[in-house]
């Protein structure tokens, strides 16, 4: 889903959507500058790294809200800015809460800096390799990825 406030365009993807890079890519292509992820499932480290990667590869800010407690927690926010103007890699973590802390958390994104970054850097929609997508569009599922009940 995509929503615009007039000053900012938000994309929204649910917790299961975050498992697939295509969800964030489609929201970016539709104009999202910030992707919000309401979530209610475990936020193990690979999932947190994936959200950071979604921010980086799509040049969008990403924020996930998750309840605390067993099999949950780790609300987080990531900026797409992974390089400073001198080419030095910077940590794009804006907010990362542990799995036990309960509360309301705020993540502040510098949208002016993000927009400027999007205008000069090479990711997002700048150099996508759409000619490679034909292989991704095949519905054929091969071993070892065949599962019972799978959509084919």
Give the ranges of each region predicted by the language model.
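C-terminal beta-strand edge segments of enzyme domains
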Residues: 67-152
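CN hydrolase (nitrilase-like) catalytic-core segments centered on the catalytic cysteine
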Residues: 9, 18-106
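Structural signature of eukaryotic scaffold interfaces centered on beta-propeller domains
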Residues: 2-4
């Amino acid at each position: 889903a995509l929503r615009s406030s007039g000053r900012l365009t938000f994309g929204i993807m649910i917790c299961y959507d975050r498992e697939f890079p295509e969800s964030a890519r489609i929201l970016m292509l539709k104009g999202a500058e910030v992707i919000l992820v309401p979530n209610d499932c475990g936020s193990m480290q690979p999932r947190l790294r994936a959200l950071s990667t979604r921010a980086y590869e799509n040049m969008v800010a990403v924020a996930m809200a998750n309840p605390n407690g067993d099999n949950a927690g780790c609300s987080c926010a990531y900026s797409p800015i992974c390089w400073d103007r001198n080419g030095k890699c910077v940590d794009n973590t804006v907010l990362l809460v542990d799995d036990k802390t309960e509360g309301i958390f705020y993540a502040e994104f510098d949208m002016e800096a993000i927009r400027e970054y999007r205008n000069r850097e090479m990711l997002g929609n700048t150099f996508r390799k759409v000619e490679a997508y034909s292989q991704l569009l095949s519905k054929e599922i091969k071993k070892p990825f065949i599962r019972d009940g799978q959509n084919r």
